[in-house]
Amino acid sequence: DEYEFIKELNPDVIITCAYGQFVPQGLLDIPPHGCINIHASLLPKLRGGAPIQHSIIDGFDKTGVTLMEMIKKMDAGRMYAKVETEITDDDTYDSLHDRLKELGAKLILENLDLYLEGKLIGEEQDENEVTISPNISKEEEHLDFSKTSREVFNHIRGLSSIPGANFIYNNEVVKAYRSKIIESFSLY
């Protein structure tokens, strides 16, 4: 059996963070307390593999982490706990990732015993509030300068430093990691 190694460990619970893939039902069924995940958004917003990037690209002013039940459907399980944080103009993917990583670790430490004791009551996600944050494609790394300055600014921040937004200049690919919005500009 492909899950024999996990079965032999006899886990009470399986915890994942930033896994970004479907977990097979056979694995979800192993631990008696189920499987839980730390997801880097305030679910049901931004289900999927790139919630941090999309929270910045889409211009959110806040995001957070959600402790959630893992089920067969991606990021759709019951929510057990959440913590939020502000997104500022100084945030990039890297800075927000690091802050959410710390918040997620704290959320697990504060809630794991309660979860294992059955004292956390999960809240179903409102399917009418669901948005999706798919993985970033190569095409989405390319900047579109026909968009507003705010949209380009957010796009650069959301992809900085990995994978980095890019544009073509003199037939060369240029990576953009930082930008600044200039409110008014004149050549004269």
Positions of PLM-derived features:
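Residues within well-ordered alpha-helical secondary structure of globular protein domains
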Residues: 8-9, 102, 158
